[in-house]
Curated annotation (Swiss-Prot):
The lineage of its organism: Bacteria, Bacillati, Mycoplasmatota, Mollicutes, Mycoplasmataceae. Keywords: Membrane, Transmembrane, Transmembrane helix. This is Uncharacterized protein MCAP_0865. It holds the Pfam family PAP2. GO terms for cellular component: membrane. It is found in: Membrane. Its main location: membrane. The keyword Membrane applies. It is a multi-pass membrane protein. It comes from the Bacteria. The chain crosses the membrane at residues 17-37, 72-92, 107-127, 155-175, 191-211, 295-315, 326-346, 354-374. Signal peptide: none annotated. It comes from Mycoplasma capricolum subsp. capricolum (strain California kid / ATCC 27343 / NCTC 10154).
Length: 385
């Protein structure tokens, strides 16, 4: 098998030009936004402005659903890409003239699909079960992160579970019964796209975790946690606040010396301010268990952009765009915009968290994709057996 590569001599398609223009526009907006929100006063004013939408019932459900979705959706698409690689391996082995183990035992592939799906559903159901009504500081019935009833989180968890299980099933069906029937499935096509996406996942999440751990930036709700607790009391939920003050596991605010972590965090917290020391956050501020739990940069946007890679790579890869594919891409772009606003509205991420994520992840995705556009591997799965 020859792994040499050579330059492709092909013109850039109109759809690629449109994508480049869209990405360029998104990058430019993010750059401008990041420059302005590097001033903490502007970042804070935007957080205060967007927070106003969280008082509306429908906005709460939308925002919390996206917050939950952003932490889980990527795994579904990682499994898609892994199965593309496995499918490609089986397809390559089954096309050879010689009999081999894989050609004689094609049932193994279906077993892999079934096993992966069942394991995913079981794990997802178990984790969702334990997350429903789980205590995160307010005890049963309250949510110490959103400062609301836990019903919002519970409903969104269930909806997310259903969507993921259905989505994974549909995706596996398409990969196994649709994509593999493409006559050039193995020729510089789906398996290469899967490798690119998994590469982006590895690099991007390494960067994300390191930056989050280094800066340990609090979320907006952590900064104003004292005010939020007062509002919860005014809304008649003294029991939630009392429960929070009498527990020591969850620390969402600032510790003034009483170990309650029930006050606003003083000072300014722009994205470039290090909380305590590198990977050593101040013990008097909000505490999280993992590096990736902190605010800067946004893992939600990172995950959603990588999901977009899967849509873009697989729907436009050497194929004509159909109305259905255009619709799916348009829906994805709406999803991306929706995610960008939702995680600000619920007092979570700062605008600077989001704009910065676009600034470094878009170039990584762009360079990874267009490196493959100019170089191609020869003789990988393209023999006629």
């Amino acid at each position: 098998m020859n792994n040499q590569f050579k330059l492709k001599n092909k013109k850039i398609k109109p759809v690629s030009i449109l994508i480049i223009l869209f990405v360029g526009f998104l990058f430019l907006i993010s750059l401008i936004g990041f420059i302005f929100t590097s001033f903490y006063t502007i970042d804070l004013k935007l957080a205060i402005f967007f927070e106003k939408g969280f008082k509306y019932e429908i906005v709460r459900y939308w925002s919390i659903f996206y917050d939950i979705l952003g932490t889980t959706e990527l795994m579904v698409f990682i499994l898609f890409n892994i199965m593309v690689l496995i499918e490609s391996w089986f397809l390559l082995k089954s096309k050879t003239k010689k009999d081999n183990f894989w050609k004689k035992n094609k049932w193994i592939l279906k077993l892999v699909y079934i096993t992966v799906y069942v394991v995913f559903v079981v794990i997802k159901c178990i984790t969702t079960y334990f997350k429903i009504n789980a205590d995160n500081g307010f005890g049963y019935g309250g949510d110490a992160i959103y400062l609301l009833s836990s019903k919002y989180r519970n409903i969104c968890l269930i909806v997310s579970l259903v969507i993921h299980c259905i989505g994974l099933f549909v995706g596996f069906y398409i990969i196994h019964y649709k994509f593999k029937n493409d006559p050039i499935y193995l020729v510089d096509k789906y398996w290469i796209q899967a490798v690119k996406i998994l590469f982006i996942v590895l690099i991007s999440y390494t960067i994300l975790v390191l930056l989050k751990g280094m800066t340990s930036r609090p979320y907006y709700y952590n900064i104003i946690y004292g005010d939020l607790l007062k509002q919860v009391k005014l809304n008649g939920h003294n029991d939630w606040v009392d429960h929070y003050l009498n527990q020591s596991t969850f620390k969402h605010g600032f510790n003034i010396g009483d170990n309650k972590y029930a006050n606003n965090i003083p000072g300014e917290w722009p994205w470039y301010r290090i909380n305590g020391g590198l990977f050593r956050p101040d013990k008097n501020l909000v505490q999280f268990k993992h590096w990736f739990d902190w605010a800067f940069p946004s893992g939600h946007i990172g995950a959603t952009l990588i999901v977009g890679c899967t849509f873009f790579y697989f729907l436009t890869n050497n194929q004509k765009l159909t109305p259905l594919k255009i619709t799916l891409l348009a829906l994805y772009f709406l999803h991306l915009v929706s995610m960008s606003f939702a995680i600000v509205v619920n007092r979570g991420h700062w605008v600077s968290d989001i704009t910065f994520t676009y600034l470094w992840l878009l170039p990584l995705i762009f360079l990874t994709h267009f490196f493959n556009s100019f170089f191609k591997f020869k003789d990988i799965g393209c023999k006629k057996y």
